[in-house]
Curated annotation (Swiss-Prot):
It is found in: Cytoplasm. Acts as an anti-CsrA protein, binds CsrA and prevents it from repressing translation of its target genes, one of which is flagellin. Binds to flagellin and participates in the assembly of the flagellum. This is Flagellar assembly factor FliW. The keyword Cytoplasm applies. It comes from the Bacteria. Disulfide bonds: none annotated. It holds the Pfam family FliW. The lineage of its organism: Bacteria, Pseudomonadati, Spirochaetota, Spirochaetia, Leptospirales. GO terms for biological process: bacterial-type flagellum assembly; regulation of translation. Keywords: Bacterial flagellum biogenesis, Chaperone, Cytoplasm, Translation regulation. SUPFAM superfamilies: BH3618-like (SSF141457). Interacts with translational regulator CsrA and flagellin(s). The keyword Ribosomal protein does not apply. InterPro entries: Flagellar_assembly_factor_FliW, Flagellar_assmbl_FliW_dom_sf.
């Protein structure tokens, strides 16, 4: 069944109810918002939008971290993973929130310390805190991608 949602980047749009992700604990700093939709801007784009279904002004640019940091593996316990019904990181869709500074998009950063993991079967999601202290909340995406390409 299709429902209409209001989005920050695209205005009104129709999405399938099956596109709605449930975050029982919300996202860090936004614990009151539990329902989100993952929206693709364009099919070719690596960036997606994680849009709150409950609050139009709450939307995050997200990207799979493997696109610019191939060896990224956050430290998350099996017990934490079981909270969304998965047993291994590979069983979920992993995303990180991207911050794009208006003055210079080339300086965009990703929150590698707080990855989002989504159970692809149940659409349950959670934002975790990686216990790997080498992960930054402001990892420069283009700098990391350039190093990965060397």
């Amino acid at each position: 069944m299709e429902i209409e949602i209001q989005t920050k980047p695209f205005g009104k749009m129709q999405i399938s109810e099956k596109q709605i992700l449930s975050f029982p604990e919300g996202l860090l700093g936004f614990e009151d918002y539990k329902k989100f939709a993952l929206i693709e801007e364009e099919e070719e784009s690596v960036f997606k939008w994680l849009q709150s279904v409950e609050e139009v002004d709450l939307a995050f640019v997200v990207i799979p971290p493997s696109l610019f940091k191939k060896e990224y593996k956050p430290l998350i316990s099996e017990q934490e993973l079981q909270g969304i019904g998965i047993t291994d990181l590979e069983d979920g869709l992993m995303l990180v929130i991207v911050t794009v500074p208006g003055e210079d998009p080339a300086l965009m950063t990703a929150n590698m310390q707080g990855p989002i993991l989504i159970n692809k079967k149940t659409l349950l999601g959670k934002q975790f805190i990686s216990r790997n202290e080498s992960h930054s909340v402001r990892e420069k995406i283009l700098a990391s991608a350039a190093v990965e390409m060397d």
